[in-house]
């Protein structure tokens, strides 16, 4: 529907040929997604993702909260390097099956996973579709070509694969422990207690099926990720790296049978992206995007530059971050990001604000805003659809009760991170390293406190002194009351 409406609009208003319409599609993004989907599809046949789930249960020692923490961390890490839509496609069936075996409600588990999938995916360029689009649409080459070279002077501020890790990963790390604390509080009843099952039976049923294929495909995936890191040196398009890895993996593992791996590709998702790019270009030709950009730009220009432009930069970052978060929650972060990419360039040039912080504000807002509602991110929709097919529907309200507070919390933390790094620190890498170091020290201290009380690692992450403080306050209040009334403690 997106493809047909977008193409129809372009044809009617601009009378462009089909060849011209295809040039509107960002093939860099399509190629990257296609390559990653093929590789993950091949790896999934090894049984490694099912093995992850069983290992998570073993490490949890029957504790439901420990299982949740392990699953969420695994989901976040996989989402950072495989993209969150693909990760959720792979882990949702495994999680549902594991919940059935342990006699748990799958929906809270699935919601927790997808929330951390969106958080983890925000840390890298390939982790979340909005980041993929930003990395492609706001690369130096893309900026130089945008609107016939209109923004060529901003090309030096374009982003690459490594920039996402350097700029976004520290901010995402700052959200992890608070996110787990909020998750534990929201699901304090569902994620408490233990479930004991026969581990040997689970291992025999959900073990790794093909070690040789896993070794080969894992090595190729490692080379692809290494290629992403080397992109600033090689300048090879990330789409070609991903597609090259996919072709190599198919040749090595499925030389004679290509139908099955290609069936694993989410072709409807790729078609949706293609139509989306055409739609956004048609809006650009009609002047809609410029119209929106002018209003946002006017709101930012209203703020004075201040010393070294800090006041306007801070306002621009926070406005773009929070508008992106709230809008992405209710629109879906993919079309929102596609619309905002050219607007970010327009704001940077028109309001005389550094492009870099605006790019990261858009990326943080779009990715974290996807947690706000069930329709906020494609991964949420995929999870809900698969869960409903398995007989466990996820309602909009149920997701909203957990997702929206998580969005508010993580966006607030990232707001602090962005103000400290870009407004106060001027984007200096030392500020990012300092905040990352403080975060890691805080996590270690938090775990140490919990472990000193005899709690396991997962419980230590969310350990707090509220109950102890409550008991202490009650004890002191009781003594004070007794003293005032003139009665002894025994009486």
Where in the sequence are the language-model features?
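Juxtamembrane helix-boundary/capping and inter-helix hinge elements in multi-pass membrane proteins
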Residues: 45-48, 58-63, 96-107, 135-162, ...
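Transmembrane alpha-helix interface/packing and boundary motifs in multi-pass membrane proteins
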Residues: 74-83, 114-126, 230-232, 321-336, ...
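Membrane-embedded alpha-helical segments and adjacent helix-loop junctions characteristic
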Residues: 15-108, 267-269, 273-351, 355-356
């Amino acid at each position: 529907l997106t493809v047909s409406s977008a193409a129809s609009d372009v044809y009617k208003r601009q009378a462009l040929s089909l060849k011209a319409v295809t040039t509107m599609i960002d093939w860099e993004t399509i190629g990257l997604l296609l390559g990653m989907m093929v590789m993950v599809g091949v790896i999934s046949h090894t049984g490694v993702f099912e093995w992850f789930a069983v290992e998570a249960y073993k490490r949890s020692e029957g504790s439901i909260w420990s299982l949740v923490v392990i699953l969420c961390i695994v989901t976040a890490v996989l989402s950072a390097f495989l993209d969150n839509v693909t990760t959720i496609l792979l882990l949702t069936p495994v999680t549902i099956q594991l919940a059935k075996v342990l006699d748990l409600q799958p929906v809270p588990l699935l919601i927790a996973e997808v929330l951390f999938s969106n958080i983890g995916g925000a840390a890298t360029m390939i982790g979340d579709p909005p980041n993929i689009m930003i990395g492609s649409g706001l690369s130096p080459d893309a900026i130089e070509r945008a609107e016939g070279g209109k923004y060529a002077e901003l090309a030096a501020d374009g982003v690459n694969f490594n920039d996402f890790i350097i700029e976004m990963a520290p901010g995402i790390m700052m959200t992890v422990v608070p996110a787990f604390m909020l998750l534990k509080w929201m699901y304090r009843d569902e994620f408490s207690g233990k479930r004991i099952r026969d581990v040997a039976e689970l291992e025999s049923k959900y073990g790794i099926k093909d070690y040789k294929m896993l070794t080969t495909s894992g090595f190729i995936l490692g080379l692809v990720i290494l290629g992403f890191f080397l992109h600033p040196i090689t300048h090879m398009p990330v789409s070609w790296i991903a597609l090259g890895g996919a072709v190599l993996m198919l040749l090595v593992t499925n030389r004679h049978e290509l139908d099955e791996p290609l069936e694993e590709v989410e072709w409807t998702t790729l078609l949706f992206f293609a139509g989306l790019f055409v739609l956004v270009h048609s809006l650009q030709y009609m002047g809609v995007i410029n119209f929106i950009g002018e209003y946002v730009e006017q709101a930012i220009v209203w703020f004075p530059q201040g010393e070294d432009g800090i006041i306007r930069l801070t306002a621009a970052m926070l406005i773009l971050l929070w508008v992106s978060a709230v809008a992405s929650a209710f629109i879906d972060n993919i079309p929102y990001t596609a619309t905002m990419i050219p607007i970010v360039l327009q704001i940077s040039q028109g309001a005389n604000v550094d492009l870099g912080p605006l790019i990261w504000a858009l990326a943080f807002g779009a990715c974290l805003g996807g947690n706000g509602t069930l329709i906020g991110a494609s991964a949420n929709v995929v999870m809900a659809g698969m869960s409903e097919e398995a007989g466990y529907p996820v309602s909009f309200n149920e997701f909203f009760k957990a997702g929206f507070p998580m969005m508010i919390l993580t966006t607030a933390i990232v707001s602090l991170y962005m103000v400290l790094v870009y407004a106060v620190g001027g984007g200096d890498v030392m500020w990012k390293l300092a905040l990352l170091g403080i975060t890691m020290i805080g996590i270690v201290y938090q775990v140490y406190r919990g472990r000193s009380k005899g709690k396991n690692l997962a419980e230590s992450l969310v350990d707090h002194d509220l109950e102890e403080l409550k008991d202490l306050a009650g004890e002191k209040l009781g003594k004070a009351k007794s003293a005032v009334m003139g009665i002894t403690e025994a009486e």
